[in-house]
Regions:
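A nucleotide- and high-energy phosphate-metabolite-utilizing enzyme signature
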Residues: 1-322
Length: 322
């Protein structure tokens, strides 16, 4: 009915426009966990219009712009992935990492995507591109996209206040999303949580990735290993960040299995904590399992936060100050 989306190459020759799906976040880093949603972006090769396919009924053909066509396609993909069935649904989908977030179009042409990142993107969007990976679609478009993102992330000059930018972003996340208090702990965005480890890794990638291509990893643990190999992260820090990150990731898995939903908050209820601790392997014979677990959690997050503060902290400032 809508035909094929077409665009022109540099010589003016018309051809079918390519399409791809970009995985961001945990999907891009191949770090999906139980109940992880999919952070995705839809891109297409370039602007143009659809043309009828061979043997198409001209009475039924409805020409569309490429953007209109690919918006329909993206909506169809989201609908299939999120369709609720008696067995549940496949994934929750999050497309807010696209240019301009929810205010922007659902799909972007590669030239428009590039222009956005060259002129309008916020510093955190450059950081988010570290994990961008084409997960489906045209191989040729994937090469173009990943070449461009490597240039944006690693080849462009860095702001003089890079550490402060990342540090302030972390502050906002902890305050607005973590929202910790005496009764609530957030293992992802809270103090010493997984985001602390990820931001340390990403800060050092941005700082050194231009001259050291081996650091251009999407996976956090691979990045930590690469930083160690390049002599940019002390062995003791690397071991503590790696073991701490694995502990928190395993905790996230168990927490989501116990609750059968996407959660990152620890309850203050002793019975629920004891149940979670037993799932993690803390034995009753060694004492109260919830206390043993909370002691290790406190020690792990404190260690992670100390390393984060040392590497990223602005002079005379502290993320832990009220």
């Amino acid at each position: 009915r809508y035909g094929l989306p077409c665009c022109e190459d540099a010589s003016g020759t018309s051809h079918e426009a390519a399409f791809a799906i970009v995985g961001m976040g945990k999907l891009g880093g191949m770090e999906l966990n139980y109940h992880s949603d999919l952070d995705i972006i839809f891109i297409y090769e370039g602007e143009g219009k659809t043309r009828p396919v061979a043997a198409a009924d001209p009475e039924r053909f409805r020409q569309q712009t490429n953007q209109q066509y690919f918006v329909r396609l993206a909506q169809r993909i989201i609908s299939i992935l999120t369709l609720m069935t008696p067995e549940g649904h496949v994934y929750d989908i999050d497309t807010r990492l696209r240019p301009s977030g929810n205010q922007g179009p659902l799909v972007s042409s590669l030239p428009a995507y590039r222009q956005y990142h060259e002129s309008s993107a916020a510093p955190w969007e450059r950081q988010a591109l570290i994990k961008a990976r084409v997960v489906a679609g045209s191989t040729e478009l994937a090469v173009c996209f990943e070449t461009f993102t490597a240039e944006i992330v690693y080849e462009r000059p860095l702001p003089d206040n890079l550490a402060e930018e990342i540090y302030r972003l972390r502050q906002r996340m902890e305050k607005e999303i973590g929202k910790e208090d005496a009764r609530h702990r957030n293992i992802k965005t809270g103090r010493g949580g997984m985001v602390d480890v990820e931001f340390v890794a990403q800060y050092l990638q941005l700082l050194h990735g231009r001259d050291r291509p081996s650091l251009r990893c999407r996976n956090t643990l691979d990045t930590l290993a690469g930083l160690l190999g390049e002599g940019l992260l002390a062995a003791d820090d690397c071991e503590k960040l790696t073991s701490g990150y694995k502990f928190l990731r395993r905790l996230e898995n168990k927490l989501r299995l116990v609750h059968d939903q996407s959660v990152n908050e620890l309850t203050s209820d002793p019975a629920s904590l004891a149940k979670l601790a037993r799932h993690l392997g803390y034995e009753d014979s060694l004492g109260q399992p919830e206390k043993l677990f909370l002691d290790q959690y406190a020690e792990t997050t404190q260690t992670i936060r100390e390393i984060f503060n040392r590497i990223l902290q602005c002079p005379g400032d502290s993320l832990d100050e009220p």
